[in-house]
Structures are given as C-alpha cells and as structure tokens.
C-alpha cells in the first residue's frame, strides 16, 4: 500500500491515490492540475522515507474537483444572569481534490 503524509493548508493529511480529500480553499480553477510538494513521509510498499522536513524527490499530482462549503458550525455565547446572548454561524470554504498519482524521482 502506497501512501504519503502531506502538509497542505497548514494541516497534515494521510494521502492515498484514487481518493479525494477536502482541503481549505485553494484559489484555483476547477479541473486544474495541482502539485503537492510538501511531503513529510512516504510509504512505498513497506519502504519508508522520512523528510527533514520535506522530501524533495516526491511529488503528488492532484486534480481539483469542486469548491464547496463545509458543514455549518454554530457558536453560541451567553453570559449567565444577563440578557446578553450571541449566536453566530460559520461555514468553512473547502476545495475537494482527487489524488491521481504519487511520483518518486
């Protein structure tokens, strides 16, 4: 099983080929190819490569499927024994990316 751990949008993801992942919004067009080059770890059929901090010889190719918004999160603030209440909602802007290939140079 071939997988990689990648840093993108300030977070780390366990990536496998043929699957799609939701990242924080990436400002690119739909259908465009992207390359992820901040690879922290690669497992290639049992052979493990660890970057210090990144692996320069590994690139991951992906395709942007869609831009979407995440599930709504409600933030409710209230002060006890007062009439102060504040309800606020937030939906995170996301980009869905299909991972096509993990390339090792």
Curated annotation (Swiss-Prot):
Q: Does the keyword Mitochondrion apply?
A: no
Would you tell me the Gene Ontology cellular component terms?
chloroplast; mitochondrial large ribosomal subunit
Query: Which InterPro entries does this one have?
Result: bL21-like (IPR028909), bL21-like_sf (IPR036164), Ribosomal_bL21 (IPR001787), Ribosomal_bL21_CS (IPR018258)
**Which Gene Ontology biological process is one annotated for this entry?**
translation
Q: Where in the cell is it found?
A: Plastid, Chloroplast
A GO term, aspect molecular function: rRNA binding
- Kindly name one Pfam family recorded for this protein: Ribosomal_L21p
**Has the keyword Cytoplasm been applied to this entry?**
no
Q: Which UniProt keywords are given for this protein, alphabetically ordered?
A: Chloroplast, Plastid, Ribonucleoprotein, Ribosomal protein, RNA-binding, rRNA-binding
List all disulphide bridges recorded for this chain. Answer: none
Chief localization class? Answer: plastid
The entry's family comment says:
Belongs to the bacterial ribosomal protein bL21 family.
| Summary of subunit composition and partner proteins | Part of the 50S ribosomal subunit.
Q: Which function does this protein serve?
A: This protein binds to 23S rRNA.
Q: What is this protein called?
A: Large ribosomal subunit protein bL21c
């Amino acid at each position: 099983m071939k997988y990689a751990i990648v840093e993108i949008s300030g977070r780390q993801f366990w990536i496998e080929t043929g699957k799609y992942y939701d990242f924080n919004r990436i400002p690119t067009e739909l259908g465009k190819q992207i390359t992820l080059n901040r690879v922290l770890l690669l497992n290639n059929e049992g052979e493990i490569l660890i970057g210090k901090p990144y692996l320069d010889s590994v690139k991951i190719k992906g395709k942007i499927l869609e831009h979407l918004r995440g599930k709504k999160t409600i933030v409710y603030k209230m002060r006890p024994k007062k009439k102060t209440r504040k309800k606020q909602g937030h939906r995170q802007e996301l980009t869905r990316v299909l991972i096509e290939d993990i390339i090792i140079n």
